[in-house]
């Protein structure tokens, strides 16, 4: 561990002294200093280094360039020792070494004073930052008081609003009661009007009857009058005749006598006639009266009957009208009640929505404040960590100077004895310093653990923000997709998913925090890699660009490989009897590889397995097709883990239809949990057993197998054309997700284009020297972490049941299965009887056994060969294009004497890529 000399001006003054110690020669201008004071923020590379640069102005003004030049010329121990060797005599050498020692002590004292001033300045700056934190806390407290006051006012206003609403409802009820009274009065008025109309109608009917009876009476009166006139006429005629007869009789006596006799007869006759006529007239009158009375009685009876019927009909009509009015009144009252209830409901809904929005705003504000507080805490932890690193560096240098002073004292005491004594004392402190540097390098990861978890919390908060921003769009799209999915698939798979997902989610939730604790270490090593391997990173970016082009060109091939893998997995249970022994052998080999390779993150694998099982269940039955019965499905190459693409269970392949839009939205299973960055290079112990670097001859043998598999691959392409067209959007999302991976990681995990490609890759290992203390400490870590992993695997074994293939695919996601298969094939074909077990850490083989082979000087060669086979199928004419690209990267690393270089290839974790993957999943759902 070293400390930056940028504040003292030119760093070459100290670099020349510490050429033999490579760990002291780092400059703080890069994003990661010697003690790994790397920034966590994505915007600025290093906040702490910038603060040191600002603080460096004061020490620069204090010390002059002459002092620096004197320190520059006096700190070279090798030059002083050579001067001691080549001096003319013991007295002159002693004086020269004495003056040089004084200058060295002067320079060291000046530097130590500069360090002390820098420490004082940093303490003062820490106090200022604490004062700012206190002010911010007081400001937040004042904001909280204002919020309480506003809440009180809002509560009062809501209480008044409730009172006003209550009064309004009371007035509304009063108005409803008044309306009911008005309706009742109107009903009574209408009923009285109806009664009046009925009486008037009865009066009119009686008047009509009176008129009819009067008409009949008039007719009868006319008949009586005519009969009386006739009787009078007949009587007058009769009297005239009688008078004529009497006149004739009076003419003669005889006649008179005869006339008298006749007269008596006539009078009697007249009397008889009169009596007869009267009797006839009376009889006629009597008959007429009887007929009239009979007729009148019949009419009156008919009128009475009709009146009763009319009255009953009128009563029924009136009753119906009353019922209709009562029902209409009830309907109006119910309608008014309904309207009032609807208004109250709308008011309550508006109030609820307003409260909900206010609560959401408050929650958002609190989340933002919490996020800001977390960032502040992370920043303060970073500063605290950097100060601890500075303190440790100062303690180391103070101890080194103390050793130097003790060595000088012993040299002065033994100077009279021999001239070789000072040479030994000069070399002894350097050895002690280098050993301490190695120890501090080994102990450095322990200090990093303090701020790893804080950074992961911040990243998790960002993922939740992305989830909250896209929640509405995702829920709408999942609802639309839920309509289009068949109901039978839902009924068959719903019960199995609910039972298994509950147990899986519990395990994932329980193991989530230790998984994420390893992620931030990648960013520190990423910065360290950018400083140490600039040239190698440019070559890797070129390879990544080429692999991305190959991925885009082979999107159809990727989709077909995903479909076929899904079919093989779904029919894996039915073929379990035939393939049981092979699956058991593969499972044992996987466990061995996991125990050696996954030492830091065993729990993360279980979380990834739990998440891999879910998309396997969520796959629709469309994937069941006879293509799994192809000859390649049972060939040795098809059963190798290479045939199972690491992207076959990518997070974008999940079907959000079978799950509720809210409880199991695709964000809940964020690809960040499965991100390959969790497999940091430091997770794999350099002390593990590793094979020797593989010769290029072993690379050629898997390529020879590629030609044999190409013939079988052509047969698959025709069957997979239709299936490949259905999943282009999933492939784009998978490409987006794999872009942040570095090139050596891609060679192990394989891009989606290589999912069905017969081409296999060999990543030769590069031995890197590791100090014995580091090896001893890192050998203890796998034993503890293997115990934790066994406990986690026991819990995961109950959840997985019989799904062994999902475990294989999970290992393939982390980029391990393919490396294992390559090692097995090279053992069988190239190595013969040798049995080698090792862990390839992102293309680097850390083999401590090779440290002593080269002696003081060793040369290491890394040859990385990548072959990408792109198969493009055109749907129109059925033509198929085969494009093969190969990229070879060769690098040599030389090591001298006690120096060692640790080349670690770390994966880049970019959260923007994760969010893009989610967006592509949304377009796929559309």
From Swiss-Prot:
BP GO terms, sorted: neurofilament bundle assembly
Location of the region described as Disordered in the Swiss-Prot/TrEMBL record: 1-51, 79-102, 487-860
Subcellular localization, as worded in the UniProt entry: Cytoplasm, Cytoskeleton; Cell projection, Axon
Acidic residues biased stretches: 490-507, 523-543, 564-584
Chain positions with Phosphoserine modification: 30, 99, 226, 346, 418, 430, 468, 484, 513, 547, 555, 560-561, 630, 635, 640, 650, 655, 665, 670, 680, 685, 690, 695, 727, 751, 757, 771, 831, 847
Ranges where the record places region Head: 2-104
Region (Tail): 413-926
Region annotation Linker 2: where it falls in the sequence: 288-291
Annotated glycosylation sites: 47
Region Linker 12, residue ranges: 249-265
PROSITE patterns (UniProt xref): IF_ROD_1 (PS00226), IF_ROD_2 (PS51842)
Regions of compositional bias (Polar residues) in chain numbering: 1-10
Modified residues (Omega-N-methylarginine): 42
Post-translational modification comment from the UniProt entry: Phosphorylated on a number of serine residues in the repeated K-S-P tripeptide motif. Phosphorylation of NFH may result in the formation of interfilament cross-links that are important in the maintenance of axonal caliber. Phosphorylation seems to play a major role in the functioning of the larger neurofilament polypeptides (NF-M and NF-H), the levels of phosphorylation being altered developmentally and coincidentally with a change in the neurofilament function.
Region of interest called Linker 1, as start-end residue ranges on this chain: 137-149
Residues with PTM N-acetylserine: 2
Domain IF rod: start-end pairs: 101-412
Low complexity bias: start-end ranges: 21-44, 673-692
Gene3D superfamilies, alphabetized: 1.20.5.170, Single helix bin, Vasodilator-stimulated phosphoprotein
SMART domains noted in UniProt: Filament
Region annotation Coil 2A: where it falls in the sequence: 266-287
Subunit structure, as described in the record: Forms heterodimers with NEFL; which can further hetero-oligomerize (in vitro). Forms heterodimers with INA (in vitro).
Protein name per UniProt: Neurofilament medium polypeptide
Lineage: Eukaryota, Metazoa, Chordata, Craniata, Vertebrata
